[in-house]
């Protein structure tokens, strides 16, 4: 049995927005509200990033066309006592999917938490 950090990515559609900043704010608020309603305050919500195919630069995944925005969101959570990576993925999708019912969730990254001498778990810096 292992402990994992699972990062899921989710596309969030928002309406009646004019700029990508508006879309990001509305999307984060929408997701946080849905997660809090299900008492999932341990799930971290972050903006997704895309990579330019030409120059390789990273930019926020938020696009607005005709007052409708599409925002990529990363959802990070820790899964404890999973039997495998696949099991951790299923648990994470089930937990988050309970709050975001009609949002497709895709695994962006899964990392196993490392145990040091039985004294506890060490979380990589980018997950703190």
Swiss-Prot record:
Q: Which domain of life is it from?
A: Archaea
One Pfam family for this entry, by name?
DUF555
Which PANTHER family does this UniProt record tie to the protein?
UPF0212 PROTEIN MJ0068, UPF0212 PROTEIN TK1194
The record's comment on protein family reads: Belongs to the UPF0212 family.
| NCBIfam families cross-referenced by the UniProt entry | PRK03922.1
> What name has this protein been given in UniProt?
UPF0212 protein TGAM_1344
Q: What is the source species?
A: Thermococcus gammatolerans (strain DSM 15229 / JCM 11827 / EJ3)
């Amino acid at each position: 049995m292992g402990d994992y950090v699972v990062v899921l990515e989710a596309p969030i559609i928002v309406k009646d927005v004019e700029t990508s900043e508006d879309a990001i704010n509305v999307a984060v608020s929408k997701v946080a509200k849905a997660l809090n309603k299900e008492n999932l305050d341990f799930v971290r919500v972050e903006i997704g990033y895309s990579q330019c195919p030409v120059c390789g630069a990273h930019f926020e995944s938020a696009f607005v066309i005709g007052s409708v925005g599409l925002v990529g969101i990363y959802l990070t959570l820790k899964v404890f006592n999973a039997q495998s990576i696949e099991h951790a993925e299923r648990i994470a999708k089930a937990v988050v999917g309970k709050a975001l019912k009609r949002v497709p969730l895709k695994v962006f990254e899964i990392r196993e938490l490392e145990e040091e001498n039985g004294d506890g778990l060490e979380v990589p810096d980018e997950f703190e």
